[in-house]
């Protein structure tokens, strides 16, 4: 069973083809709009939608040409329907529905977060058994789930204000750095010369619940930098280190609590921030010290991509889900 996946929820235009029977990704194409939006310091929704319109058909032609497949080989077309930028979602959904109608192929709406949650399965060495705890950590979401079976997601905790990735992005703006924030902060943190110069708060780390808060950490960065007399690149690197260390410390601590609370031994990490080297290192240490299994997506599939949508669509399709009509129903916000 072969699925074409379409991702257009924000500023990445992604198409991929996944073979469920072989558990194999056949092809994957991605167009990133980072350079387009960088000069604005963030994603401009109208520009994102227009670029999706310009690129989707081109990527589709390329992916079929390179694989030698045709639409006759496709059993289902999966597309991101929620959450995301409504205009961008509409472009992808309309493209998918149109292809389905023309070629008489079933279509299926996919939740963007479900795509991220399943993305570690794109690693051929990942054989994840249920149940497990999942941390979805990105620019838009920071959430902990207990996953008992496919489609059974119990929310354990989430950010009550900024998402972790959003805090990274806002920190780069406060420090006059570039976009996107996660990469900029991590790279500069690696250049820190005095890792103990700044001590920042760990919001909600010691709270018994599994919720997060990163707004206060962001404010602490702002106040610390405002009061700093020597705003040199060296001190900027030291502050980036302190910020990253605090944010990662909170994420790892909450993951440990979630595993203890649910009595699970398997942990899945996904979303854009899952590419962070320090986060991966600290969670690997946690797993090693306590005998847990931990699963990450391949690095190239941490951020938004069509491969995870094709994968999630395949799992939904074999579980009996598919669109019943041509109605397009996309949502800016939607819980998993």
From Swiss-Prot:
Main location: cytoplasm
Top-rank EC class of the record's enzyme: transferase
Coiled coil regions, renumbered to chain: none
Binding positions (substrate): 136-140, 169, 182, 276
Record-listed Fe cation binding positions: 112, 116, 304
Cofactor note text: Binds 1 Fe(2+) ion per subunit.
GO MF annotations, alphabetized: iron ion binding; N(6)-L-threonylcarbamoyladenine synthase activity
EC number of the protein: 2.3.1.234
Cofactor(s) listed in the protein's UniProt record: Fe(2+)
Gene Ontology terms: cellular component: cytoplasm
Record's signal peptide: none
Keyword terms, alphabetized: Acyltransferase, Cytoplasm, Iron, Metal-binding, Transferase, tRNA processing
Function: Required for the formation of a threonylcarbamoyl group on adenosine at position 37 (t(6)A37) in tRNAs that read codons beginning with adenine. Is involved in the transfer of the threonylcarbamoyl moiety of threonylcarbamoyl-AMP (TC-AMP) to the N6 group of A37, together with TsaE and TsaB. TsaD likely plays a direct catalytic role in this reaction.
PANTHER family cross-referenced by the UniProt entry: TRNA N6-ADENOSINE THREONYLCARBAMOYLTRANSFERASE, TRNA N6-ADENOSINE THREONYLCARBAMOYLTRANSFERASE, MITOCHONDRIAL
Listed name of the protein: tRNA N6-adenosine threonylcarbamoyltransferase
Lineage: Bacteria, Pseudomonadati, Pseudomonadota, Gammaproteobacteria, Thiotrichales
Record gene name: tsaD
